[in-house]
């Protein structure tokens, strides 16, 4: 065979193919440019959509979800309140409004307020009582630390226990708050104590304030909470039913806790009686009586009240009575910080969320009801129907991922399309390689044909392979044909089921469309016409594309193997061998004729392919470009295959579920019909109102917006152009102005500094000279301002109250009208918005297109202007750099020289300033010293004169004091005794007593140094007057008889006297009390039976050691109560002790 002829015949002239590829490359570049613009616009819109979604849509959806959650919790809580309180719908509405309002205005949320309402309702409060008590409950919660539930419980128990009205809840909170502020009892401690003692205290007549004051005093002593409550409860309970021991103890103490009407006296009076009755008792005696009266467990608390005394208890009670406003004030103080304000803001947000939930609740209720019905229908379906619904849901769920994959494919195709323009040269470079490969392939084919024809051994080997290949393909075909038959039958059934499903859906959809005035025929005709037009436009192009793709499949497969790793001649040989075997099997003749036919077909195929590419490649590129531009993101080439695959999947699924789909479709259509009917009935009104409002609001804006945009762009362009042109001149002028200012400042700096120094010195001198008048005038002005403010303040307060009252009355009186107007305005706005929606969308599109076009058109100008601006700036700086450096150097040099020359003047001026300042201060010091000296002299003279007056006043005061007492000696024994103690030095000389007087020592201490001189001058007169007073008292008592009332006093005197007698020394006889009684009518009382009638007889020890004697003369004594008896007994006892001490006897206390 002639190999040269074979090679010449197999050589392919690819010049036409190359030219067509060059044309396709230019078309691809133009397509890439257009796609790039579209891709940029799409990216911008995508970014805008993402930004709006992230910044607006998602936060609003999140807030709506949170609002629904918060609102549902609040509604559930209020339903509990309604159920417990038995509230009607109208009462529930009022309570909801109050809870929302309290949540917005306080640091507590509306839900917390609702929980407080629940606790009050559980305590038996009615709706009106709950609403009256809630502000006080929240005030108490704010003071106690924020637990609304505990505060409401404490409030309810306190109000009920003391029989208070619910509107007194605020006062209860004020009492708790004031007690917490003034004592160690926190509000939680007070609430805990009230749980135990409040009912008992109220039943015994104690008020809330007095009980709280008692608990507070106990808390100061460390008795808090439940311990204080049980202590006070135990004490009051024992008093309510006293035992015999308690009655005896009360009789011994002389106390009574009930009045004549059988009512318990206030607690402060009880404390007063106990404090007086136990004043003279020892600690053991007092504790014994208190334990008897109040019990062992209440001893500590009652001791705390006794130690505090009735005055502190009464003061605390009055403070709690007048404590209105304390809780609010304390709560405001405690919440005056950022954390509390944030909590209050959270409460306000929750109130807003509840309002939003209330607005959405009707629509949400309908949606939930519809979903519930759908779920109930699903539950009631047959098992087969339920399975079909699940399958259909899975299909719908898969639609999203499929669309996602499709979108990714579209995006990838766009990116590949952009990359085509860069692959063009590479494809052109590979054309030579492809031509060489084709030539090698032809050579191999020629060699194979020669070997098969000339070599019998090779031909026999090839022929022996034919049966094996045929057997293999035959077995595969025998297995495949039954499967394809089964698949065809299955697809036929699927088609029938799909037809039935389509008829069912079509009938239902037809009925639905008829409600809107649309027939299924019209809809089908329109859809069919649309699909037909699309297929007609795409049919020819896809036909040609399909022919090209079918030819290129084998080549793509061969080069794919090489791309996967089988590279070089071996990979190409393997791919060619696979293609050859496939073509040979396709002929069905596994012999030499088949091989010859393969090569003939291959030759014809290559020639046909080359002709096809040369002829149709330009048309293919043009049509492909048009399709990629018109169909989004160039997916047209992949859409048919994707649609075919998806259609097959959907057909298979539809065939499976078609048996149960009619029932499901019927149920779904019924639900949809109900929803659409409701929407259709209300939709015209909504649309009409919305369109009117939107039209009114945005019509003018839409009409004027294009003009505004165009004018704005023109103005901006003109400004930029003008700025670019004038920038060099502006920079040069600015530099010149700055240099001129700096140079002028340097030249005039000495004069400026000198003038400043003169001004400062003048101000200092004037200030030093006039500091006194300035201060005096300032004080006068300040006093005048204060006096004027004080005079006007009541009027200002009155006017402010009137203004606030008038403003509140006006707001409250017009609140319904304001709310109604707001609602109408909101509805009108929504109606206009809906009416204007089409125009708004159209206007928005126009604006977007205009902005996009303006941006695209203006970018080159903006870049050009920026370049010109940068050039001008660089040129201006370069041209002025030299002058700037020169001017800066000159300015620095001049500034340094001027400062150096002015240093001397500055030092001199500073020295003068300091010198003048010191001189001024020195002159002022002399004046100040003079003033202080004169002031001291005046003070000393005043004090000296006043000292003389004090001495004189002291003498006169003592003289008058003694004269007054002397004149009143005969009127009262008590006055005589006090006067005798005041002049104790004279009395002890008269009676022969030598012990010091404590009373005189105290009187000397408290009289003061001012009386020292006067007392020194009056010592002799005082001694004479004291002797005269003692003699007068003795003479007066000798003529007086004792008169003691017999109403139980004698027994008291006897008890005290016996105690006194037990303290006498053993050397003295113990006088009998009956002797004392018998001697009561005698002016002389011989207590020790000495037999002496002379009261002035010296008292000395007798020879038989019978003891000393004491003579006491007692006049008439009027006993008014037990205190007088105590004073008389103690006076006798003390006088006896003094007498015995005067004789040197040791008297035990």
Swiss-Prot record:
Region (Disordered): 1084-1109
Pfam families reported in the protein's UniProt record: PhageMin_Tail
Signal peptide range in chain numbering: none
UniProt key word NAD: no
GO CC list: host cell membrane; membrane; virion component
Keywords assigned: Host membrane, Membrane, Transmembrane, Transmembrane helix, Viral release from host cell, Viral tail assembly, Virion
Major localization class: host cell
Domain of life, source organism: Viruses
Transmembrane segments: 389-409, 431-451, 561-581, 689-709, 726-746, 781-801, 840-860, 865-885
Physiological role: Plays a role in virion tail formation. The length of the tape measure protein is proportional to the length of the phage's tail.
Protein name listed in UniProt: Tape measure protein
Organism field: Pneumococcus phage Dp-1
Lineage, highest ranks first: Viruses, Duplodnaviria, Heunggongvirae, Uroviricota, Caudoviricetes
Encoding gene (name): TMP
């Amino acid at each position: 065979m002639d190999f040269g002829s074979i090679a010449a015949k197999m050589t392919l002239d690819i010049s036409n193919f190359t030219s067509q590829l060059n044309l396709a490359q230019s078309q691809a570049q133009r397509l890439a440019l257009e796609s790039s613009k579209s891709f940029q616009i799409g990216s911008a819109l995508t970014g805008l959509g993402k930004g709006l979604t992230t910044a607006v849509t998602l936060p609003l959806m999140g807030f709506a979800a949170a609002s629904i959650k918060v609102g549902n919790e609040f509604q559930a809580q209020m339903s509990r309140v309604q159920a417990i309180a038995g509230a009607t719908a109208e009462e529930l509405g009022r309570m909801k409004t109050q809870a929302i309002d309290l949540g917005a205005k306080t640091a507590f949320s509306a839900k917390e307020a609702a929980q407080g309402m629940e606790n009050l309702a559980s305590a038996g409060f009615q709706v009106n009582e709950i609403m009256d008590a809630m502000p006080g409950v929240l005030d108490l919660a704010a003071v106690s630390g924020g637990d609304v539930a505990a505060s409401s419980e404490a409030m309810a128990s306190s109000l009920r226990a003391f029989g208070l009205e619910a509107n007194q809840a605020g006062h209860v909170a004020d009492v708790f708050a004031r007690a917490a502020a003034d004592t160690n009892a926190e509000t939680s401690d007070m609430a805990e104590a009230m749980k135990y003692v409040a009912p008992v205290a109220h039943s015994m007549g104690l008020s809330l304030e007095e009980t709280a004051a008692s608990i507070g005093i106990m808390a100061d002593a460390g008795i808090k909470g439940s311990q204080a409550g049980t202590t006070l409860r135990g004490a009051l309970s024992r008093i309510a039913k006293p035992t015999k021991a308690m009655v005896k103890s009360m009789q011994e103490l002389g106390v009574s806790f009930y009045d004549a009407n059988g009512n318990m006296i206030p607690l402060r009076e009880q404390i007063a009686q106990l404090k007086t009755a136990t004043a003279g008792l020892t600690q053991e005696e007092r504790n014994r009586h208190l334990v008897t009266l109040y019990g062992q467990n209440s001893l500590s608390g009652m001791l705390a009240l006794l130690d505090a005394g009735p005055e502190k208890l009464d003061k605390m009670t009055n403070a709690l009575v007048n404590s209105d406003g304390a809780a609010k004030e304390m709560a405001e103080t405690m919440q005056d910080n950022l954390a509390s304000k944030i909590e209050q803001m959270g409460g306000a947000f929750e109130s807003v969320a509840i309002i939003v939930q209330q607005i959405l609740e009707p629509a949400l209720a309908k949606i939930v009801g519809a979903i519930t019905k759908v779920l109930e229908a699903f539950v009631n379906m047959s098992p087969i129907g339920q399975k079909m619904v699940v399958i259909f849901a899975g299909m719908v769920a898969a639609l999203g991922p499929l669309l996602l994959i499709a979108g990714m494919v579209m995006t990838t195709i766009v990116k590949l399309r952009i990359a085509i323009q860069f692959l063009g040269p590479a494809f052109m470079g590979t054309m030579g390689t492809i031509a060489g490969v084709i030539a090698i392939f032809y050579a191999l084919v020629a060699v194979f044909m020669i070997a098969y024809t000339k070599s019998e051994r090779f031909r026999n080997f090839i022929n022996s392979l034919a049966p094996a290949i045929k057997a293999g393909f035959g077995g595969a075909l025998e297995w495949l044909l039954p499967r394809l038959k089964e698949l065809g039958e299955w697809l036929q059934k699927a088609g029938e089921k799909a037809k039935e499903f389509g008829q069912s859906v079509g009938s239902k959809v037809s009925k639905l469309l008829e409600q809107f005035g649309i027939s299924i025929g019209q809809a089908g005709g329109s859809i069919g016409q649309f699909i037909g037009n699309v297929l007609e436009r795409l049919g020819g192009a896809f036909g040609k594309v399909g022919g090209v793709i079918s030819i290129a499949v084998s080549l793509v497969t061969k080069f794919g193997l090489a791309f996967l790793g089988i590279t070089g001649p071996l990979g190409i040989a393997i791919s060619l061998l696979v293609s050859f075997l496939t073509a040979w099997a396709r002929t069905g003749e596994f012999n030499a004729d088949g091989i010859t036919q393969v090569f003939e077909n291959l030759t014809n195929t290559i020639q046909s392919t080359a002709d096809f590419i040369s002829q149709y490649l330009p048309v293919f590129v043009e049509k492909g470009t048009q399709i990629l531009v018109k169909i989004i993101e160039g997916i047209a080439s992949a859409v048919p295959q994707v649609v075919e695959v998806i259609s097959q999947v959907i057909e298979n699924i539809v065939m499976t579920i078609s048996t149960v789909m009619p029932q499901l479709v019927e149920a779904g259509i019924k639900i949809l019909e109900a929803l659409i009917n409701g929407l259709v009935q209300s939709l015209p009104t909504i649309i009409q109102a919305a369109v009117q409002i939107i039209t009114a609001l945005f019509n003018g804006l839409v009409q004027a917006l294009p003009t505004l945009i165009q004018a704005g762009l023109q103005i901006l362009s003109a400004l930029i152009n003008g700025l670019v042109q004038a920038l060099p001149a502006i920079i040069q002028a600015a530099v010149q102005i700055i240099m001129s200012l700096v140079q002028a400042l340097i030249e005039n700096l000495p004069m400026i500094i000198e003038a400043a120094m003169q001004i400062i010195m003048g101000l200092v001198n004037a200030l030093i000279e006039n500091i006194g008048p300035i201060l005096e005038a300032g004080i006068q002005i300040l006093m005048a301002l204060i006096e004027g403010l004080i005079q006007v303040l009541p009027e200002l307060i009155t006017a402010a109250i009137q203004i606030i009252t008038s403003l509140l009355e006006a707001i409250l009186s017009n609140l319904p009208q304001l709310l109604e107007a707001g609602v109408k305005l909101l509805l009108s706005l929504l109606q206009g918005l809906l009416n204007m929606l089409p125009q708004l969308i159209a206007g928005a599109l126009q604006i977007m297109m205009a902005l996009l076009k303006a941006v695209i058109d203006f970018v080159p100008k903006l870049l050009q202007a920026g370049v010109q601006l940068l050039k001008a700036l660089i040129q201006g700086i370069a041209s002025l750099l030299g002058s700037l450096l020169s001017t800066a150097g000159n300015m620095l040099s001049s500034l340094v020289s001027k400062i150096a020359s002015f240093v001397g003047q500055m030092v001199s001026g500073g020295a003068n300033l300091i010198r003048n300042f010191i001189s001024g201060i020195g002159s002022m010091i002399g004046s100040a010293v003079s003033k202080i000296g004169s002031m001291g002299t005046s003070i000393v003279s005043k004090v000296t004169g006043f000292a003389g007056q004090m001495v004189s006043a002291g003498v006169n005061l003592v003289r008058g004091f003694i004269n007054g007492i002397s004149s009143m000696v005969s009127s009262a024994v008590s006055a005589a005794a006090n006067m005798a103690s005041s002049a104790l030095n004279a009395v002890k000389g008269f009676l022969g007593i030598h012990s010091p007087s404590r009373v005189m020592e105290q009187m000397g201490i408290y009289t003061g140094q001012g009386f020292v001189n006067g007392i020194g001058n009056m010592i002799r007169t005082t001694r004479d007057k004291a002797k005269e007073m003692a003699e007068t008292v003795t003479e007066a008592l000798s003529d007086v008889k004792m008169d003691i009332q017999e109403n139980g006093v004698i027994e008291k005197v006897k008890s005290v006297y016996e105690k006194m007698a037990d303290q006498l020394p053993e050397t003295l006889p113990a006088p009998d009390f009956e002797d004392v009684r018998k001697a009561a009518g005698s002016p002389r009382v011989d207590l020790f039976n000495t037999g002496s009638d002379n009261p002035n007889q010296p008292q000395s020890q007798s020879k038989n050691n019978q003891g000393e004697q004491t003579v006491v003369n007692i006049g008439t004594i009027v006993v008014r109560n037990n205190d007088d008896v105590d004073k008389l007994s103690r006076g006798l006892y003390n006088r006896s002790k003094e007498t015995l001490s005067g004789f040197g006897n040791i008297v035990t206390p």
